[in-house]
Amino acid sequence: YHPYIDSYMDSIRGGEIESSKEIKQAMNYIEFKLNNPDVVIKVNMIDKAVELIERYFKITLYDWELLVIALIHCYYKSTDMVVFNKFLIMMGRGNGKNGFISAIAWYLTTHYHGVQEYNIDIVANSEKQAKTSFNDVYKMLERTWNKSKRFFYKTKEEITNLKTQSYIR
């Protein structure tokens, strides 16, 4: 399918990554969906997403994050609709969930994702928790503001991509 998908599926199925039966079932479901001849995987978009996220957020993405990014870019040729429209990320502390949400939220607002007005409201169990990811994006923009100011408008409440009119709040 794509190296990020294949590698993760092989690691789960081969036992290299410890996983639950539900994760193994998810691999079967992903394979079932991707075997549809109407599915296209947009490799260039995957590569660009990974490049931008790792460069701007100064991180190296985990294998599970690479899998999710790849699955985000699977579409039906006939409708250009996404194959996977919901993702549940449920894991213990310290596996990069907040950092990933920050980076992927930012990427999804860019013209590289290609969707106008792709708006993101970050929701969590508490306002403090929800602000963590928002603040990660805000700080990244602050750090790169000489370049980012051409593409984003930011306040402490909302970040707007000027080209796509997408926001994060």
Residue ranges and their predicted role:
Residues 1-169:
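Phosphate/NTP-binding elements of NTP-utilizing enzymes
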